[in-house]
Structure formats: C-alpha cells, structure tokens
Amino acid sequence: MARTTFQGPLRSLGGIYQQGPATVVEITTSTTLTPEDHGGRIISIGGSLAAALTLTLPTINTSANSTTSGPGQDPSTANNEGVMYTIWVPTTISTSSLKIGTTSGSSDLYVGAVISIDSDTSGAVVAFSANGSSNDFINLNGTTTGGVAGTWVQIVAIAADKYMVSGNVIGSGTVATPFADS
C-alpha cells in the first residue's frame, strides 16, 4: 500500500474505499503481517492447509511520530496505531489450524469479542471475549473454535499494547473460545 505525502485532514464527500484485485491478499503459509502489505486489506485463508498457519501481527507502535507531534507528520512513520487487518476464511480449515498471534516478546494483547456460531446442529450463538490481560492468540481449528467457511475476524491496533478484535467465528460441534495465551 503506497504512503501518501499530503498535509492536513482528508475529506471525502463520497467516501473512501479500496477496490481491485490487490484488495484481497491470499496467504497460504505462516506470515508476519505488515501495515504496508496487509493493513486495510482482506486477508484470505482457508481450505486444506499444509501445516499449521500462523499470522503474526506487528508490534503496536504508538510513540513514533505521535499525533501530538504537530503538522507535517512523516508519511514514513513507524506508528501503526489504527491499522486494521481483516482475516476471512472462505473455505473451511480442514487439515490443520490458523493461529493469529501478536509478536513474541511484545506486550500486545487482545481486547474485544467475537460472535461464535454453531453451524452444524443447534445454531447456537455465543459471544467470547478476550480477557485483555493475557490473551495474545486467536486459534481457529476448523471446528469448535471456528474456522468454518464464512469466518471473519477484524483486528485493529487501537492503542499501545491493545489490539481490538471483532468478528463472526463459525464453528461446529460445541463451540469454544478462540482466544488463548499461545
């Protein structure tokens, strides 16, 4: 994603959106996500994974060129506050698992909740929330913790050490929380 160099607020009366083939990024192997390559895009994962796939979120940086630094902010700043990652599972994860974790050694944790839907029997709907104190992984196994086709999770770097999570996690069997400490 290109970085802009304009100064001042951006105003659009017609809205701002991304479109085209680069809007959806397909990932088939473990990857460290970056704001430039994955932020604001739909990350598509699913199907028969060759091995457990881990998406690693970048460490949240709110101190580089903060909002209090005034006009003329550096377009190449390392500050990634507000970057949003949308992970979508178009085909049920069938042979392994998907883990979405924060960078090892960082103090970044999840806050927020996902709605979990039992797709195979009762149609039960349950909300699971991250505990905000130790959960640094979202684990989707294709069954009880989600990862059935149609699952999506949106993750936003909302503040220092906090990734805000929302989404619909579709599972089968007795659904369980996808939030974990590893």
Which role does the model predict for each range below?
Residues 3-120, 157, 161-182:
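Exposed extracellular interaction/assembly regions and N-terminal maturation sites
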Residues 1, 55, 140-144:
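Short aromatic-glycine motifs in intrinsically disordered, low-complexity regions
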